[in-house]
Each structure stands twice: as structure tokens, then as C-alpha cells.
Amino acid sequence: MSDKEVLLEVTSDHLNTGLRGVPVGTCRTSFVTPTEGVHYCGYPIAELATFAPEDIIYLLFNKELPTPEQSREIRAELAARATIPGDVESVLKTLPRDGHPMDWLSVGIHTLGMLETTNDWREDAMNLIARMPRLMGLIFRIRDGRADGIPADDPQASLVDRFVN
């Protein structure tokens, strides 16, 4: 494909239909069909809803669903990466409690990035995924005024269990 090849033409008719049927971007891991909706790596999202989040993470990184052994391996890898470096909790405690939750999340993610980055996209992405349940739990509790007595994280628990604990 050349840099000057016309990929599509947009007319005023398209604007009146919400761009239905007009490609607005490309993505190697997902696509949308009018009948089955969103697909990740070729699988309809309705089918993937029955899988554990850890298995979907494996799918997005490897473009295939994991075997039972691979599923155990990614869970172990996420558990090994789960501990948040530094004292993110102290940083979060300095934020205004009435701040927007997305601003809190942004500060938390940026703090994690400042405390530890490998400059390898896969390593950094896996670290962030593994640490998100704890980060979200800290944000919810601290914003809600329940910063005292936050239970320790259990990295061996599933991502969902860590998030709701």
C-alpha cells in the first residue's frame, strides 16, 4: 500500500449515519461486525466473557487463548509482578478527596511509571496490569476516607479477587 493510496471517501451521507460502515481506524487485535459485534483476536466478545481476565490478557499478548498450563503461567507471572514499588499509597493520600477518580488513576499510573519502568513495552504493560487491582483498591478506599486499616494485598489471588478485596 502506498502512502498516497485513497482508502475511503467520506460524503455528507456518511455523517448523517454516524459513520456506520466507514472505517475510522485499524487495530491488529480487534474488529467489529454488524452482527456479532466486537471481536478480540478473532473471538467474539460474548464468547470471551466466559474466560478469566488473566486468560484474555494472555490472548491479547499472544493472539491465542492459553492452554491450562499457559493460564497457570500467566497467573504466576502476574502474581510475581503485583507488588507496587515505592510508596504509592502516600502519594495518593496527598490528593484532594473530591478530585475526579480518573485524575486519581492518572496520578497513580504516572507515579508507578516514575517509580519503576523498564523501557520494554511488554514488561511495563504486564507490570501495570498486575498492579492495577491494588492501585484501584487504594484509590477507592482513600477517596472514600477509609485509608486506615487497608488490608494487605494478596498477589496469589486472581485479578478480580484482588480488585474487590
Where are the regions a protein language model picked out?
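Hydrophobic alpha-helical bundle cores within soluble ligand-binding/oligomerization subdomains
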Residues: 1-165
